[in-house]
Amino acid sequence: MANMSVQLVAVERRLWSGEATAVVAQTTEGEIGILSGHEPVLGQLVEGGVVKITTPEKETVTAAVHGGFLSVTADGVSVLAESAELADEIDVAQAREDVKRGDEQARARALSRLRAAGHSS
């Protein structure tokens, strides 16, 4: 499978950058899977979504993303999130607490963080 260049960037920092074989993200139009050679597209990311990047070594980089855009060009894929966290950085206990006591937007973010960290609730 051919590789493509992928950037995962949030307003506050670059979370991940490198070669990948696939990217899956949730947009306002539905879930989209991107492979090398995909047609150019610009999609709006959903609030409280999860992005999964598959590396050439078959490792999966997972992140909780909150708003932003996904851009696919001939040069690669850019995920530009308003905010994002890598799955291995998520405090699962805190996210569960946020689900219990948060308002609707805080709950959506917390649920996204739990999904990215591999916990359904």
From Swiss-Prot:
Localization in the cell = Cell membrane
Its placement in the membrane is given as: Peripheral membrane protein
An example Gene Ontology CC term for this record: plasma membrane
The answer on whether this UniProt entry bears the keyword Transport reads yes
Pfam families associated with the record: ATP-synt_DE_N
- Indicate what this protein is called per its UniProt record: ATP synthase epsilon chain
Cross-referenced CDD domains: F1-ATPase_delta
Instruction: Describe its function.
Output: Produces ATP from ADP in the presence of a proton gradient across the membrane.
List, alphabetically, the SUPFAM superfamilies matched: Epsilon subunit of F1F0-ATP synthase N-terminal domain (SSF51344)
Q: Entry's InterPro entries? A: ATP_synth_F1_dsu/esu (IPR001469), ATP_synth_F1_dsu/esu_N (IPR020546), ATPsynth_dsu/esu_N (IPR036771)
Native source organism of the sequence: Saccharopolyspora erythraea (strain ATCC 11635 / DSM 40517 / JCM 4748 / NBRC 13426 / NCIMB 8594 / NRRL 2338)
Signal peptide limits = none
Q: How does it assemble?
A: F-type ATPases have 2 components, CF(1) - the catalytic core - and CF(0) - the membrane proton channel. CF(1) has five subunits: alpha(3), beta(3), gamma(1), delta(1), epsilon(1). CF(0) has three main subunits: a, b and c.
Which terms in the Gene Ontology molecular function aspect does this entry carry?
A: ATP binding; proton-transporting ATP synthase activity, rotational mechanism
Keywords associated with the record: ATP synthesis, Cell membrane, CF(1), Hydrogen ion transport, Ion transport, Membrane, Transport
- Entry similarity comment: Belongs to the ATPase epsilon chain family.
